[in-house]
């Protein structure tokens, strides 16, 4: 399992196409417009959007199979961190289960 110990970023597995990333970003802000009257606004509406998108669209972690010490992903699968708030250095925790 891969997970960032935060609630404003997510780990996901998807195609590494920059156009898809732009579509995902647009979907976040279409679903959760920053102009909405959010109640969690201490750090600005973008922070509320990040929390909502992590919880309701992405989830904050993903599982990835490991075989012979390497990620065993499909041709179009790539694991990446989705930054939903402010760019910053992030930690990603890894948990390994099994043999």
Feature-to-residue mapping (PLM):
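Active-site histidine-anchored catalytic micro-motif
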Residues: 1-99
């Amino acid at each position: 399992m891969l997970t960032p110990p935060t609630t404003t970023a997510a780990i996901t597995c998807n195609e590494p196409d920059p156009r898809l990333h732009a579509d995902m970003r647009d979907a976040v802000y279409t679903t959760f417009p920053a102009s909405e009257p959010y109640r969690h606004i201490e750090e600005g509406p973008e922070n509320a959007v990040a929390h909502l998108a992590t919880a309701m669209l992405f989830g904050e972690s993903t599982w990835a199979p490991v075989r012979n010490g390497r990620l065993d992903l499909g041709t179009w699968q790539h694991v990446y961190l989705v930054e939903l708030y402010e760019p910053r250095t992030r930690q990603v925790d890894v948990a390994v289960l099994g043999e």
